[in-house]
């Protein structure tokens, strides 16, 4: 039986020892409380004495309660965590001891001690093994190459491509090609990450001295001596000098009809590429200067805004002046014209019957405290205000002074009330616009 227990222990230990790495998800402090218990005893005189006591055992119980609280929280959120990390395992790690804010003891009144323990909820993180690279990733990671290659083909967007060592390369940098575009030299052939399918032609670099390809009728020996599509075969290469094939296959005619890069090819390629290279250099060193256009547009907008503000101020001032001017019309001191204020005044006078001379008009209400005075209560008379009557320090304030003070205070309260109402209305209007 003992051996079975040991075997089971080893079986459980091995997976845990080889477990994945663990990372913390959340850390929190969990709390338990030790509440004092009432203990009754008697003093020396035999009188009953009550004490509130907390022992070390109570602190241990409070610590266990804090750990149980952490376990309850872990059990509640474990299902949610499993949905977030379905391939992970979860565990709760708590401290061995708790932190208390007091010590065991006794007091005359009820009291408590708080026990706190830190709980760390963790999840397993599997060791990620590097996956094998795909053929596309292998091709894309290869470094650029340079040189002259045959079997070059042109892409849909006009670029030149080769299939070399099982990967596709694109010609970048300075590129020079023959007239037919099947042989090109580039300063940088960069891999595109594309893997050619079986059956697609592959390219090979042309070494120094190679002036031809392996076209029809040509061979390796024909290429070495100038053969090509029409170059000599086995006798037009190394044996061309003795059999006469060299003069017609690899000799004078082989160079002109083969796949070599001639002086004319290089000159033509440079001539074609020069404008684009010049434009690219110019674009990289310069940029369009639109500062003048932007400044002109900004000046025009500023002028329009200034004119609009000036006209609005002028119309407003003229309208206010015409409203308070006794003469108006052609004899007005503020100029003539139908401003927005003038139209508003005409509407107020003609349709609403509001005149600045009338009782309760807007103009008089804002500036004259007597406009609304008839509606304000005036009281039931006035008597002199007397302090310390009959003494040497008697102070007496007459009704005339009291009336003046009352008038001033009522005017102040009226202004404050109007200002409060005005602020409230404008604040509501601003909020409505937003």
UniProtKB/Swiss-Prot annotation:
InterPro entries: Attachment_G3P_N, Attachment_G3P_N_sf. Residues 89-107 are annotated as: G1 (Gly-rich linker). Keywords: Capsid protein, Disulfide bond, Host membrane, Host-virus interaction, Membrane, Signal, Transmembrane, Transmembrane helix, Viral attachment to host adhesion receptor, Viral attachment to host cell, Viral attachment to host cell pilus, Viral attachment to host entry receptor, Viral extrusion, Viral penetration into host cytoplasm, Viral penetration into host cytoplasm via pilus retraction, Viral release from host cell, Virion, Virus entry into host cell. Disulfide bonds join 63-98, 139-167, 177-184. Residues 252-434, 259-434 are annotated as: CT. Residues 191-260 are annotated as: Disordered. Residues 209-258 are annotated as: Gly-rich linker. The gene is III. Residues 20-130 are annotated as: N1. Interacts with G6P; this interaction is required for proper integration of G3P and G6P into the virion. Interacts with G8P. Interacts with the tip of the host pilus. Interacts (via N-terminus) with host TolA. Its main location: virion. It is found in: Virion; Host membrane. GO terms for cellular component: host cell membrane; membrane; viral capsid. Plays essential roles both in the penetration of the viral genome into the bacterial host via pilus retraction and in the extrusion process. During the initial step of infection, G3P mediates adsorption of the phage to its primary receptor, the tip of host F-pilus. Attachment of the phage causes pilus retraction bringing the viral particle into close proximity of the host cell inner membrane. Subsequent interaction with the host entry receptors TolA (low affinity) and penetration of the viral DNA into the host cytoplasm. Consists of 3 domains (N1/D1, N2/D2, and CT), a glycine-rich repeats and a C-terminal transmembrane segment. The N2 domain interacts with the F pilus, whereas the N1 domain forms a complex with the C-terminal domain of TolA although with low affinity. The pilus and TolA binding domains are independent of each other in stability and folding. Pfam families: G3P_pilus-bind (PF21443), Phage_Coat_A (PF05357). This is Attachment protein G3P. Residues 1-19 form the signal peptide. It is a single-pass type I membrane protein. The keyword Transmembrane applies. Belongs to the inovirus G3P protein family. One of its GO terms (biological process) is entry receptor-mediated virion attachment to host cell. Residues 132-200 are annotated as: N2. Residues 211-257 have a biased composition (Gly residues).
């Amino acid at each position: 039986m003992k051996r079975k227990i040991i075997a089971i222990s080893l079986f459980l230990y091995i997976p845990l020892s080889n477990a994945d790495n663990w990372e913390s998800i959340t850390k929190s402090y969990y709390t338990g409380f030790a509440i004092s218990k009432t203990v009754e005893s008697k003093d020396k005189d035999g009188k009953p004495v009550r004490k509130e006591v907390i022992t070390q055992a109570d602190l241990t119980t409070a610590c266990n309660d804090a750990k149980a609280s952490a376990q309850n929280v872990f059990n509640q959120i474990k299902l949610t965590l499993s949905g977030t990390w379905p391939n992970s395992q979860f565990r709760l790690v708590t401290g061995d001891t708790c932190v208390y804010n007091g010590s065991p003891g006794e007091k005359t009144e009820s009291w408590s001690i708080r026990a706190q323990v830190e709980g760390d909820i963790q999840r397993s993180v599997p060791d990620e093994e590097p996956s094998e690279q795909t053929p596309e990733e292998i091709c894309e990671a290869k470094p650029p190459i340079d040189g002259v290659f045959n079997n070059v083909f042109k892409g849909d967007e006009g670029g030149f491509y080769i299939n070399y060592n099982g990967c596709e390369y694109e010609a970048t940098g300075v590129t020079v090609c023959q007239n037919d575009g099947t042989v090109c030299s580039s300063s940088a052939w960069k891999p595109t990450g594309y893997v050619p399918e079986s059956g697609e032609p592959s390219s090979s670099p042309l070494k120094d001295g190679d002036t031809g390809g392996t076209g029809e009728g040509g061979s390796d020996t024909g290429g070495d001596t100038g053969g090509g599509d029409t170059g000599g075969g086995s006798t037009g290469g190394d044996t061309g000098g003795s059999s006469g094939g060299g003069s017609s296959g690899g000799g004078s005619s082989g160079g002109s009809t083969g796949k070599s890069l001639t002086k004319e090819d290089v000159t033509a390629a440079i001539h074609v590429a020069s404008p684009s290279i010049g434009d690219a250099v110019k674009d990289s060193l310069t940029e369009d200067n639109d500062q003048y256009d932007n400044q002109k547009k900004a000046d025009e907008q500023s002028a329009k805004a200034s004119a609009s503000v000036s006209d609005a101020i002028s119309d407003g001032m003229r309208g206010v002046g015409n409203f308070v001017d006794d003469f108006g019309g052609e004899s007005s001191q503020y100029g003539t014209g139908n401003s927005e204020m003038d139209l508003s005044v005409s509407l107020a006078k003609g349709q609403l019957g509001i005149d600045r001379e009338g009782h309760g008009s807007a103009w008089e209400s804002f500036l004259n405290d007597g406009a609304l005075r008839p509606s304000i209560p005036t009281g039931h008379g006035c008597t002199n205000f007397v302090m310390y009557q009959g003494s040497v320090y008697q102070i007496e304030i007459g009704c005339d002074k009291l009336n003046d003070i009352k008038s001033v205070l009522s005017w102040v309260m009226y202004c404050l009330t109007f200002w409060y109402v005005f602020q409230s209305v404008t604040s509501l209007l601003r909020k409505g616009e937003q």
